[in-house]
Amino acid sequence: MSNNAAYAVTPVKTTSTSSRTTFHFAAGLCSGLTSSILLQPADLLKTRVQQSQKTASLLPTIKTILSSPHPIRGLWRGTLPSALRTGFGSALYFTSLNALRQGLAQTEASMAIAASSSDGKSRTSSSALPKLSNWGNLATGAVARTAAGFVMMPVTVLKVRYESDYYAYRSLYSAGRDIVRTEGVRGLFSGFGATAARDAPYAGLYVLFYEQLKRRLASVASSEQSEQPLKSTSSSSINFVSGGLAAGLATAITNPFDAVKTRLQLMPGKYGNMIRAVRLMIREDGVRSLFGGLGLRITRKALSSALAWTVYEELILRAEAHWAEKDKIDL
């Protein structure tokens, strides 16, 4: 089966094979683990820059880590909680996102049919997801991310505390035990309000920008290929570029929430809640503190989102092509 044939799938999926929950979970887990492990140094540096009450500079932070006895280990400090959070968080996110999009696609059936019929038999889209309206993309992204974020919140708190040099935790177990002992179980959910306020608009905007960019880039690529079905390499390139650009835009808009979230998770006793945290940060460190780590976060988010979504969509497209071929043989 050729690559072109393998990708000749319609944008709207209504068969049972297109919503196999287990595979969406596995594909999300694989994509999340890949991006989190490769990009852990950028995430650690972002946490170190944002933790400072006097916004730290990137270069001195890097020099401090590299001058330590174990610089490589230092750059990948916190990889385990980060991989757990991002891996399983991505698995939950993509699984719930697929379920939400499949359900919402049924209510937008007329739009989906029109889009499908206009595409004909060739696939001129790089997407493995059902086509939705802009509001559909915004809503499903926001809801799926908030739900996954709540489930993974304790791991997120452990990750931030362990990456930070504000605490001297020797292991994840000691970190969790100390948090529960001193702050109670609610300490494991410190900063959830700021996290949800960051993740809901970020994820919604990301999916909106991502789908729009893919549509436009696929249209350009299709015209250059004389309306031939998109090749596998073209689809992957479109998804990667779209993922990076969408993440950069969404990250720049939502970075203040990320900065507030980091302070709340590191020093909940001092900052208390989102409103108090914003006031204290601006009063003590200036408005620039709300954009601490922006460059690092954009870099990491652009790369991680591009990697995660490209890997996820590639796995789903190949799996659905395999299932479709298997169904034909069974018939």
Swiss-Prot record:
Annotated localization: Mitochondrion inner membrane
The UniProt record lists the keyword Transmembrane helix: yes
Gene Ontology terms: biological process: glycine import into mitochondrion; heme biosynthetic process
Listed transmembrane segments: 25-50, 78-104, 138-163, 191-214, 238-264, 293-311
Catalytic activity annotation: glycine(in) = glycine(out)
Entries under InterPro entries matching the protein: Hem25/SLC25A38, Mitochondrial_sb/sol_carrier, Mt_carrier_dom_sf
GO MF terms held by the record: glycine transmembrane transporter activity
Membrane topology per record: Multi-pass membrane protein
PROSITE patterns attached to this UniProt entry: SOLCAR
Keywords assigned: Membrane, Mitochondrion, Mitochondrion inner membrane, Repeat, Transmembrane, Transmembrane helix, Transport
One Pfam family here: Mito_carr
This protein's GO CC annotations: mitochondrial inner membrane
Solcar repeat ranges per the UniProt record: 19-103, 132-216, 234-318
Task of the protein: Mitochondrial glycine transporter that imports glycine into the mitochondrial matrix. Plays an important role in providing glycine for the first enzymatic step in heme biosynthesis, the condensation of glycine with succinyl-CoA to produce 5-aminolevulinate (ALA) in the mitochondrial matrix.
HAMAP family cross-referenced by the UniProt entry: SLC25A38
Family to which the UniProt record says this protein belongs: Belongs to the mitochondrial carrier (TC 2.A.29) family. SLC25A38 subfamily.
Protein name: Mitochondrial glycine transporter
